[in-house]
C-alpha cells in the first residue's frame, strides 16, 4: 500500500477519517483496559486525547498484542501503541481541520508547511497557523509529553519515530514492525 510523505497509506487515512466521524471514545471496558496499561503520568495524557483517537489507539494496542504475542507485549509496548499519537492534543484540531492540513502537507510538503506555520509564540493560545505546525510535529511533541510524564524509553521513542522509515528506528525492528502494522500505516 502506497504511503504519502510520512502520513501513512490512503487506506489508513480514510479509516482514521471515517472512524473520527463518530465522536465517542472506546467502550468502558476498553477504556479501563487501556488505563491499566499506562503509568500515572501517561493516564493524564490519555485523557486529553479525543474519543476517536483513544478508540483508534485501543485497536492499535490490541492488534499489536495479537501480532507480537503476549510474551513480547510488555507494558511499555502497549503504552507505545496507545500513546503514539498523543502529540496531536497540542494542536487541539478536530477531524476536518486535520484532514485539510494533511492534504495540504501532502501537496506542498510537510517541511514546507511546518516552515510556513512558524514557531508558536509564548501566547496563551497559539494562532491557527502555529497550531498547523503543532499538528504536523505531533510525533516530536508527543515524545516530549511522554518524556515529561515519566514514560519508558520505548514508549517515548515510538512516539517520536512512528512516521520515520524503519531504518531510522531505534525501537527493536520486530516491535516497530508490529506497532506500524497495527496502526495500519
Predicted segments, located by residue:
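Divalent metal-dependent catalytic cores for phosphoryl transfer on phosphate-bearing substrates
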Residues: 43-185
